[in-house]
Amino acid sequence: MKITTLLAAVSATILLIWSAAAETLVYQGTRGIGTGKHIVFIANDHEYRSEETCPALAKILAKRHGFRCTVIFGLDENGAIKGGGRNMPGMEALKDADLLFFYARFMNLTDEQVGFLVDYFERGGPVVGVRTSTHGFNGQKGKWAKLNYNYTGDDYFGGLGEQIFGNTWHKERGQSHYGSNHVMGCRITPDATAAAHPILMGVESIHAYSGAYKSQPPADATPLLDVQVLNTFHASDDLNTDKPVVNAGWSRDSYIAPSGAKKNARVVYASYGASEDLLSEDGRRFLINACIWAGGWENKIKQNLNVSIVGKFTPSAYNNGVGLAGVKPLDLAGWNSQIMPANAEIGGLSDPEKVKKLARVIKNRPELRARIATEYPELFAKGGLLEGF
């Protein structure tokens, strides 16, 4: 009886460990800058494919530079990756993190899961954030409602985005779209005043497919990047002269934790970050350099630091609603894994409202259009939702 009970307990423990491992993704490096260092990536946005950006960067930092990288995703009820998912198992990995890479949009999680993030900031951990991280929470209730991007209480005005990164989604005092998203790409270059900053070593020009944001950096920020809106989605010299150059990224040396305490910690923010943006070598280089600088290892940054892609990387078209479905964290495990799997199905095409939004997305992405037309020809047929596109 005792043996049976013991075996049952051991089996339950093994199952629990396996379950936890299946819900997060870990890339373990062996040697390099990051030996003995742990970077945790939070990947949970609705649109810009943080679930692709984060693993791609994590692979580079682990394989090329020796870091241990843990990627935590929003998941659905079946354990598949879901942008904007309200369940993020594995947040306890933040307990021993040396650096946080934060890529989220409008999250709404359990108090327990948010608590691990709050604890990280209360101990003054460094952080790199991209794109929508300035508006990482929305609809959070109760204990952590102050983290919401639109929080107006004096105790944490502007929520996590404004207090940690220095901006929130607000046209007057924070960020807003600048140019036509999904239609106009942008050219991002180093700010002239920061040419000698270690993060910018080797960075010359980034083509970003994600549309520009107009940001208002906080007073204590060091400007790092400028952005010029293009009239084209793909890289070109066709500059939109109606849109003057604005800021696209900065660093700062402190933030306000949720308790209200000022923490001396390095912060880097960049307003690009869609997975398609990582097709730019300098786009990857800036973010890899940012992680190394934020962690305090800037003496290891080199002009020719290896930022080459690990494995196969085929980024998805960013959009809100239609994306690859059924992919689980372990599908992305291993150096040779593909981000994202070639056999992943396109989800969301049964929702007419989501399909309608695809029109301007597929216009600039002929390969995606061809795949959808092959698998769902009725959408392009006469009377179909994508007729004429």
Labelled PLM ranges:
Residues 1-6:
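Positively charged n-region of N-terminal signal peptides that target proteins for export
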Residues 22-34, 52-53, 63-64, 92, ...:
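Extracellular ligand-binding/catalytic regions of CAZymes and related secreted enzymes
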Residues 46-47, 107, 134-136, 205, ...:
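Short, solvent-exposed loop/turn segments at secondary-structure junctions
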Residues 8-18:
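Bacterial N-terminal signal peptides
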Residues 40, 128, 222-224, 268-270:
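Hydrophobic/aromatic beta-strand patches that form the interior of the parallel beta-sheet core
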Residues 93, 102, 107-198:
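A glycine-rich, often tryptophan-bearing local segment used as a flexible ligand/cofactor-contacting loop or short
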Residues 27-28, 38-42, 46-137:
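Helical hinge/lid and interdomain linker segments adjacent to catalytic or ligand-binding clefts
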Residues 24-25, 62, 68, 82-85, ...:
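Catalytic beta-strand/loop cores that center a nucleophilic Ser/Cys/Thr
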